[in-house]
Amino acid sequence: MNNRHILMLASALALSVAILPGMTSAAEKNYELVEPDVLSVAITGDMPGLVARDGKLTGYDGDILQIAAEKLGLTIKPVPMEWSGAIAAVQTGRVDVIGGNVAWTKQRAETLSMSDPTGYFQNGITSKKDAGWHTLKDLENRKVGSMTGFSFLPELRKVAGLELSLYDSTDAALRDLLAGRIEALVGDPPVIDYAISKNPDWGLVNLAFTDNNPDFPLLTGLGRQYVFGLSKENTGLAADLSNQIRALWTSCEVRAIGQRYGNVSDANYTPSAENFRAGVDRPTDWLPPTCTK
């Protein structure tokens, strides 16, 4: 072997040594994935949360998860499914993560590893503009629609005289509202706001609950959190996703992402005054992320 070849080989070896320490596979990070180095994502199909286009994720949560996955060296694999079966799919290992306006609850935290919040929200009532309902009392003795599997359903069922219809998609619920088969809808705020903004001729309005009733915390509470949910075996990946999410909050890139999808209200970026995750699925000194710029 001549000197030139020896020098080329030495340079190649030096380059590989320089690169390899910073390159770790998902297996080396102890991620529990359906496929090695691939992040299988449950896609329930509602904008502006998380949908797949041309093999990549889009939507508010979609953009965040796409950025995080690329930073962690993971390839995205979208897996379409109904929302009603998505959490079970994560728990049984058929997909790795669920996102797209998934609300944190204490009950879900007992069975899933949940990331730091991608955003914040408050539920509301969708109705005809001339109704303009925004309180629990407005829903009494009315036909109301909501979504299968939503965390606040037990509270919604406690409203006096309320007749509840459940749907597997926001589109189906909105169609029934427009057709008069239900009088109001309590659904996914960003999805409904997005749909109404695209269809002003519907004559609908989505108004946040003004009750903030402590007896109905999941239904009317302020500053609730949207998160990504993973299996309990995937705490390492959940922690790494949280680090990537927090970086997007620190840089305020979350607001730039939100701007693309109509998430412009300060409520989308303002946590609850009550730090309800501290001591539950986070350390007691944990604080929810904010954009301070």
Write out the residue ranges for each language-model feature:
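Extracytoplasmic small-molecule ligand-binding "clamshell" domains
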Residues: A27-V102, E110, Y261-V264
